[in-house]
Amino acid sequence: QLDKIKEKPVKKNLSSDVWIKSLKVALISITNYPFGVGLNNFEIAHEKFINEISVNYPMTQKLNIQDASNNLSKIITEFGIFSLMLAYLLLRFIFSKNIDLGYKIFLLPNIFTQLLFRGAGYFNGGFIIFFIVMIYLIFEKNNK
């Protein structure tokens, strides 16, 4: 199954090629390092696994080697199975009846944009701030 992920190129443009490459690095990395490679070490996993991944454009192998192009790939690679905690917190936030819809409408697009589409790391673009506010709201609303 993992070999199919590594070898199967899909027709795409350069931007989506980079995005898919980052997800492939994350999937290969989590199978080899289930506890992750450590904070801000995506580049190490990228360097180790990039030659196992087929891409459409040679330039793809050189792009977004530090930030993974999206925070989901970066989180999975760097934190491994501990990234499931992120998924748990996100689902808890989404389905909580104690958190006002206004907070969800404000926070979720910002979090999902950086998580799935384009994110330049945890400390850029407000990702960590949005995430901290989300966690605060989860626990603050549950204590009332």
Where are the regions a protein language model picked out?
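Alpha-helical transmembrane signal-anchor/signal-peptide segments
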Residues: Q1-L2
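Transmembrane alpha-helices of multi-pass inner-membrane enzymes
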Residues: L90, F106-L115, A120-K144
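Membrane-interface micro-motifs in multi-pass membrane enzymes
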Residues: A68-N71, I75-S83, A120-I128
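Hydrophobic transmembrane alpha-helices and their immediate junctions
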Residues: K74-F112, E140
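Short, flexible micro-motifs
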Residues: L39-N41, S83-L86, I128-I129
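Long extracytoplasmic/lumenal interhelical loops at the membrane interface
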Residues: P9-F79
